[in-house]
Amino acid sequence: MRAIVEEHDKIGHACKLSFVPSPRERATIPRMNTTTSKDAASESDPARSFQLSKPDLLTLAAIAIVATLITNLLHEGLGHGGMCIATGGQPLVISTVHFACSAEPRLVAAGGTLANLVFGAICWAVSRALKRAARWRYFFWLLMTFNLFEAGGYFLFSGIGNIGDWTAVVAGWQPVWAWRVGLAALGVITYFILFVPLCLRELRPFLGDAAKTRVRRAWQLTLVPYLTSGILSTAAGALNPVSPILILISAAAASFGGHSGLAWMASLLHGPRIPSTELQMPEIERSWGWIIAALVLAILFIAGLGPGVKLHSV
């Protein structure tokens, strides 16, 4: 109900009416304004909006597929293949799990890991330069993570298991145990002490600033590419022309093993060791362009490169 206040104008004796809100209505109005201001603040603040939304998982998987393909080609093609040509060898066959060269010097074996390290650093710089393009920054973050994890993983894998690229690099060097211990130690330092913390810190712009939200979003942004990359790499590796053993020691080891940091590093966000950052990216929304491109490239990767491509006859 509203009370009517009647005021008499001294000159015209006119009657002026005004409406005064009741006490209940006066109490209601500020609440409405407060709610509206909170809604506006949450819409304009990416960190707040992260608490109510989640990245599109299908797009995350698509980006992971493209990043997996590129990382593989960098390692096998540009790394091993480029070093083969640079050392005077003749490229023979390339697949998703091996590269055959007419000569097998140590540098050819080391070329894959060296390419991973170089391009991991390049992708780190590119991702930091992207301030608003969420999908592209996440793509380069994944490229950085895949490349650095594979590099550190190869050191560790060769040192502990005596299998892989760096086993060929140090073959014949004495004492054998010292080189294996050195490779294992290098793998532990690069993978667990350098690369995992670095990659997790670079993921912070996608996480928001609320503690529970950060951990939940980190699991989504790391587990999806981990599983996607592992499944794709293993499926393509199953068609390799050399030996079924390469499915285990190359395809599965490099993906499920080498990328395994993605499966657990989100747990490091508990506690104050890795604080949030002021820069927060927009949400990663669905992109049919990424999804369609990923499907086409995945088919070509499995059916084309999986069985191997002959580059030169022996």
Describe each PLM feature range.
Residues I29-V314:
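Hydrophobic transmembrane alpha-helices and their immediate loop junctions
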Residues E7-I11:
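Alpha-helix boundary/capping motif
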